[in-house]
Amino acid sequence: MKKIFSIFDFYIKSSLHLSFCVLSLIVITYLRLDQEINFLILFVVFNATVITYNFIKYASTLPYYFFVSNISIKKIQYLSFVCGIFLIISIFFLNFNTILFGFFLSFFCFIYVIPFNRTKRNIRNYSRIKIFIVAFVWASVTVWFPLTINNEIDYLNSFLVFLQRFVFVVAYTLPFEIRDLKYDSIKLETIPQLYGIISTKKIAYFLLILFVAITFIIQPFSISFIIGDLLIALLTSLMILKTKENQKKYFASFWVESIPLVWLLLMVFLILTTF
């Protein structure tokens, strides 16, 4: 049992779970826009997500991150190194537009952690805009990036899916902001710090209503996607309702984070069963 728990803990801390959640959102994009699933894109994004999030998590320990003796951190380093090799190899199979857009998104990830001016502040320190930049990058990675490999794109519907994804990610991120209240410096001025937990939850509920409203605009009109989006909005609302500052260890990092996986499974089930 201890071994299973150790593997599960590594699965969470190494960003593997998060990477599968990101892939779920990409597959949802393909399904929503009736595009063929590109497994090379999924492979690239999976490896890039593991590397990026492990870098973000442990960047505060730089340069000591590369010389740590902690076994669990070393395992994460090895995983990131292997993913890095896979990512470099896979880049050679992408087209120029996809590579260019990938570097554009990588730039945001880089300045999220690395200071970009003399004040030694990075995007992570600008908390009033941080959550929106995170949502922009997530929405771009899971909507625009997969479409760069296609020649025929419905730009209106793609933009609506991007907008819906952006709204969803902001709401989806707020439980993590609430969880981190006891760790974040008051100077960060996160949404829960500025408006309180109750008001933060109200903001999330409003965003989820907007998320559902956008569903009715996206074409073609599909009962499967509407039901799926309604149910996932309800599930996310329930998770937000249950979110509190002092929560169980894996509530946010596993259960809340798993919402995109549930969303994908729900979508596949509804597509296969709805006439």
What are these regions (language model features)?
Residues 190-239:
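Glycine/small-residue-rich hydrophobic helix-like segments
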Residues 49-81, 170-208:
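Solvent-exposed interhelical
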Residues 47-59, 106-118, 140, 165-181, ...:
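Transmembrane alpha-helical segments that form the membrane-embedded catalytic/substrate-channel core
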Residues 2-18, 61-79, 114-136, 190, ...:
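Interhelical loop and helix-boundary elements at the membrane-water interface
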